[in-house]
Structure formats: C-alpha cells, structure tokens
C-alpha cells in the first residue's frame, strides 16, 4: 500500500460531511474537536488547526511579537520552511550546526550563535527524533529566549513519556501528504500552554476575528480586533485528522518495530556506516530511517549515490535526506543580512546521509524482501 492510506470509515464519512453542507471550520464540529483531541494527546492546554505546517510556523513566530530585527536560531539542516518562516515574518535567521548522528541542533553551537538580538530558537525534531530539549530549555530560560518546536516530522515522539511539542513556548506540526499524520494532503497544527499565544493564533488565522464576539445575529458585528488572514482548516481535513490521531500510537509502534529490523541489518556493516538508535527514554516517531557513510571510505560520495540509485532501481524508496544546508538555497543568498559560514557537520551529512522510507502499511513479509534488497545492494557496492 502507498502512504498516506485512508480508512474506509474516513472515505465513507467524506460523503456524509459533504452532504451536510457543513464543510467550513466555522460551521461544523470537527475542527474544534480535532484541536481539543490533539491538545489532549500532546499534553498542552490549547491547539489551533491550520491549513498547512508552513502557515503554522509563521503564525507561531508572529504570536511571540518579537522586537524588530530579532534573530532566531534555526538548524541549517531541515526543510526549507523551518527557516523561510523566519524571513517571511520579518526576522533574521541565524543558522546553527547539527549533531553528526542525531542530525538535531547542537546546544554548543546555539551558545556560540546567541547575541543580544537573539529572541527565539526553532528546535526541529528531524526525522522524528527529539532534540536535546532539557539542555535547550535550560539555556533558553537562562537567556530569556523563546522556544518554538517544529514537530513536522515527529508526530508522537517523546522524551521520558513527555510528548514533543510540550517543551517549548509554542509548537507546530505538518499534516502534509507524506507525514506520519496526513489530513488529505495538507494541514497543520499549532499548540501551546500559553493563553496569550493561543488567543493571538486563534484570531489571526481567521482574519483577526474576536471569536468570543462572533455570534450570528440580525445585526452586523464589528469583531476584527487586528489584521489577520485566512489559514483555517476544513471540516473534512479535521475529520481525517481525528481518524489519524486515533491510530497514531498503533502506527508509531509499527514504525518502531520496522525500524528495528532495518537497523539490525545495518548494524552488520559498521565498518561502512554510522547510525544512531535512541535510548529507551527517547521515543522517535521514525519519519525516516537514516544511516551515514563513513568519510574515511575511498570515494564515499560516489558509493552513496550508487547505493541510492541501485535501491531505487529495485523499488525501494530511498533519498539523500533532508536539505543539508538551507543557507545555500538561492533565496537566502539574495538576503543582505545573511552571510553564513558553511557549517562543518551539515556539510558532512549532506555528503554521507542515506534516508529510507518507513512504510507502516506494508506487511513484515514485504519488509523482509526489502531488507534482502538492501543487503544485496550494500554488499555489491562494497564488494563483500
């Protein structure tokens, strides 16, 4: 099966919701219910559903109301939107290096990048693996810096049974088509424990409307407290989100079990690859499974591309991985206030990483066939 894969219950209910005519967030019950259930799952007081994960990031930043020309520290290895959201909200991205194994933002490099203008840190839980939130929170509290958690790839990930997205000041998720949770192709969520941030986000994504003064009467109501925009999610998307949320723990357990059998194989080739498997206290969401060629291998970059090419020929979905150095994108080169020095670890990961898709809709027998292909491709390329 391909992912996303939607249940028969969801597919049948799409027709029912369409037939009801209540398809807009402001008319139906599912958007509000999705927000409440998501808050319960994460362990936060408030959540706001939006049209996509990028919108969620931009609104989250806006809610912090940072001073003009503020700097926001972000890992250089991530999806483009993790950094473009900073530019689109009028602030300055400062890129930090990442750990060579976890691929998450390095606390030591955050410390080096902090200036008087640093007002926030975006922690990206890349590939579903939680960042070192304890260390980051201690530093942020000491320096009075806000934390935004980008959980776009980390649905259900946790540290000591505490869900990612419940550590920072405000957090965001994406429900794009390839994510662990998908709301029919697009969707996003913002979550926080802070009422003032919730109030801003709730109003901003609906044209700045004061939702407490939004009753339908025969009179016209002036209820726009400030300028916002329309980033609402639909009722059908919200119903899909509720369906996915019900099954998230089951999905996550299956993804974890699948990842274990792949790592069992990769561990046989430690002369060629580095990899990271988290400790018991850290639960990854396993959005992608990463391993990295060792740089002391002759022609390691050529071998990497050959492995990826061979795996793809055999219908095993494989990638080089996340954008290794976002600041190399042409869009950032045009900005006068961005003059980054290339970051050592990000550069290395850009040359060594291999990412495998984890498809939890497949049976274990199908994964065993894929494992055999992976074994054959590795041994062929290293002439074992």
Give the ranges of each region predicted by the language model.
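PLP-dependent aminotransferase-like
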Residues: 62-142, 146-151, 158
